[in-house]
Design a protein with these regions (language model features):
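A short, internal acetyl-CoA/4′-phosphopantetheine-binding micro-motif in the GNAT/acyltransferase core
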Residues: 67-76
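Short, well-ordered alpha-helix to beta-strand connector turns
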Residues: 40-42, 94, 178, 262
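Conserved GNAT acetyl-CoA-binding A-motif
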Residues: 89-103
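Conserved acetyl-CoA-binding loop-helix of GNAT-fold acetyltransferases
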Residues: 75-88, 167-172
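Nucleotidyltransferase catalytic core that binds NTPs
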Residues: 101-360
């Protein structure tokens, strides 16, 4: 498909054409990008009127990627044309568009209407554009905020894939030490258990805790929209995890903390997942600067597994489901989760887990 304007000609790339893909790969390689067609849903390319390729841009989901314009055209309308084309397409079915770029490029995107959300210097910043924004999420937080006269207010973020007695232990611990606990549930649909199921299992499992307010994580709390691993492909994976964590924690510190007057954030000790360990490290480094105490709780274990404690883990539950041996981890499960997994209502999820080797 070809579009024309007075200065440039743009085309939609055929991601199934080896020739088209190689064309963009060669162009982006000059700028140290390794373009992979499977990393994007849509790509457009921009030519000058002499037929020379001078720019390109893509998107994956609601995230803009690989937006590059030749140096000599960066003062022209080429950059704005690419970004406007991509955002127009995305906003036909999305409420948000996100872009990750170097902090030095913030002003360029702000010049075409994007709003800066947070940075993890010196490597990248995240900006957004659309019908919805982080201001709408702050408004949501204000609507669910509970009136209180205490400053003993805590927060915790959970995924619960699925909800286990380990999660329940951490939540009960935080609730017992706080007057009010805001429990953020990751809303991203990249887990084996869909968000609505995870929410319901948690809600049923903590019904006895009257000082806990459940909160939807939205686009800004451990969301795929805020994890730009594609942007740092040439960096060490430890640095990727570190910068993603900093971005997430900075958003929490700058928007959630002042809105809900959070004074404490509870986390579980992480022994297995390096990415989660990086989040914990970032919280310890960043949140105290915002007058938020980070309280790390040792995870709950049931007996021993050889010479080490048998820590309760959602991944162990999913593995037991794969092996059709849910009873081997029944002690890991609160009543709400056990009843669900032993019912026909969970059949589709159990089949999905059995067919997948994903750690999520």
């Amino acid at each position: 498909m070809i579009f024309e304007n007075t200065d440039f000609r743009q085309e939609v790339l055929d991601l199934h054409s080896p020739y088209d893909v190689k064309l963009v790969q060669s162009f982006l390689k000059k700028y140290n990008f390794d373009f992979l067609s499977e990393d994007v849903d849509y790509t457009m390319i921009l030519y000058n009127l002499n037929g020379n390729l001078i720019g390109t841009g893509s998107h994956k989901g609601k995230i803009l990627k690989y937006v590059v314009v030749e140096q000599q055209y960066r003062e022209s309308s080429a950059f704005a044309q690419i970004v406007t084309h991509l955002t127009d397409i995305l906003l036909q079915h999305e409420k948000y568009v996100f872009v990750f770029t170097l902090p030095a490029n913030i002003v360029i995107f702000e010049g075409i209407g994007f709003k800066h959300i947070a940075s993890a210097p010196p490597l990248f910043s995240v900006l957004e554009f659309g019908y919805k924004s982080i201001t709408d999420y702050v408004d949501y937080l204000l609507r669910i905020q509970r009136d209180t006269h205490t400053d003993n207010i805590a927060a915790m973020v959970v995924n619960c894939n699925p909800f286990t007695n380990g999660h329940l232990f951490l939540i009960e611990k935080a609730a017992s030490e706080s007057e009010l606990l805001y429990l953020f549930v990751v809303e991203e649909e990249h887990s084996a258990f869909p968000f609505d199921i995870r929410w319901k299992l948690i809600e049923n499992g903590i019904a006895h805790l009257k000082n806990v307010v459940m909160v939807k994580g939205g686009e800004y709390i451990v969301s795929g929209s805020i994890f730009p691993s594609y942007f740092l492909k040439n960096e060490e994976i430890s640095l990727v995890s570190q910068k993603q964590a900093e971005l997430d924690v900075n958003i929490f510190a700058n928007y959630v903390v002042p809105t809900l007057q959070i004074k404490k954030r509870y986390i579980g000790t992480e022994n297995l997942c390096k990415t989660t360990a990086a989040y914990n490290k970032a919280m310890h480094e960043i949140l105290p600067k915002h007058n938020v105490e980070v309280i790390e709780i040792k995870r709950k274990a049931i007996g021993m597994c050889g010479d080490v404690p048998n820590f309760i883990s959602a991944s162990k539950v999913r593995q037991a489901i794969r092996e059709n041996n849910i009873m081997s981890v029944i002690e890991f499960l609160p009543e709400s989760t056990a009843n669900f997994l032993l019912s026909n209502d969970s059949w589709e999820i159990r089949q999905k887990i059995k067919k997948s080797d994903s750690r999520h």
